């Protein structure tokens, strides 16, 4: 079957929340808050992408991910670029992206040691609907009060530079070595290309599209290319099987997707540029 629903994994985090996104059961009072929801591929497979939801009540650690070359030199299959779609954000919520001004890795390391790295970064306000593509090497941190869908290259490789005194391992030497201590520049996002199809991100390690239409359409992925379908709101059918918000599906080959009216779908695939999808 070319469409496959992925397993949902709820991950408890002290910085998480109990009020989640529609499609997910809220956290239980008295239980640990939920910080992440992952969609796991079949055991033994090396999926190129990973989709998560994040729910934050505190600032997360300041961190960085290596690119492909540095990751492979360290024994990993790939580096990590990420994209975020902000679903909800409190009025004062921010995300740190890059440094306020060009600096040196030595200065960044000193800031990580004494905590001044917090003020070295550019904290930008975010709101629902914002899309950010954070390439490997970008020093970043997700702030409090944010609900976000994160699409990333699938590798468990994060270098924490600063964690507000929390007792977790830091990776200062490795992280500084792969950091680009420069201001963040938003990559071009093409946007609406017609037919209910918008390109949110392309030109990096993967393409992220947003779809909204009513009725059935057939898509055909090139051989060897897998897509990830994320129903943000609404639902519908994929190859006759029902899907709904709170799920994630992988798609290979030719598939018929029939969303309900006003449904909001994301579709990601690991390719540097958009490909013809619709038959």
Q: What are the residue ranges of the model-derived segments?
A:
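Transition-metal
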Residues: 1-103, 164-185, 208, 268, ...
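Short beta-strand His + acidic residue motifs that chelate non-heme Fe in jelly-roll/DSBH
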Residues: 71-73, 139-144, 149-152, 219-221, ...
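Short acidic-glycine-tyrosine-enriched beta hairpin
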Residues: 121-133, 142, 147, 237-258
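C-terminal amphipathic alpha-helical segment
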Residues: 159-226
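His/acidic/aromatic-lined binding-pocket segments of jelly-roll/cupin-type domains
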Residues: 51-53, 60, 76, 82-85, ...
């Amino acid at each position: 079957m070319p469409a496959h629903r992925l397993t949902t994994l709820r991950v408890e985090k002290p910085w998480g929340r109990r009020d989640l996104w529609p499609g997910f059961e809220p956290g239980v009072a008295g239980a640990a808050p939920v910080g992440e929801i992952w969609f796991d591929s079949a055991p033994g497979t090396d999926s190129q992408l990973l989709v998560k939801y994040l729910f934050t009540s505190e600032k997360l650690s300041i961190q960085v991910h290596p690119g492909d070359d540095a990751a492979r030199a360290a024994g990993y299959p790939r580096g990590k670029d990420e994209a975020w779609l902000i679903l909800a954000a409190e009025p004062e919520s921010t995300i740190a992206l890059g440094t306020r001004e060009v600096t040196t890795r030595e200065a960044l390391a000193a800031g990580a040691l004494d905590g001044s790295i917090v003020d070295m970064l550019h904290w930008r306000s975010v709101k629902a609907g914002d899309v950010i593509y954070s390439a490997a090497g970008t020093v970043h941190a997700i702030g409090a009060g944010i609900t976000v869908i994160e699409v990333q290259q699938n590798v468990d490789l994060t270098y924490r530079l600063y964690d507000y005194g929390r007792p977790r391992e830091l990776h200062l030497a490795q992280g500084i070595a792969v950091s680009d201590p420069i201001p963040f520049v938003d990559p071009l996002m093409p946007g609406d290309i017609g037919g209910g199809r918008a390109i949110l991100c392309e030109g990096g390690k993967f393409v992220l599209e947003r779809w909204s239409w009513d009725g059935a359409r057939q898509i055909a992925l090139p051989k060897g290319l897998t897509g990830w379908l994320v129903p943000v709101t609404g639902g519908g059918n994929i190859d006759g099987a029902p899907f709904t918000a709170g799920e994630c599906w992988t798609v290979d080959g030719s598939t018929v997707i029939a969303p309900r009216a006003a449904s909001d779908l994301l579709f990601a695939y690991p390719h540097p540029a958009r490909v013809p999808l619709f038959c």
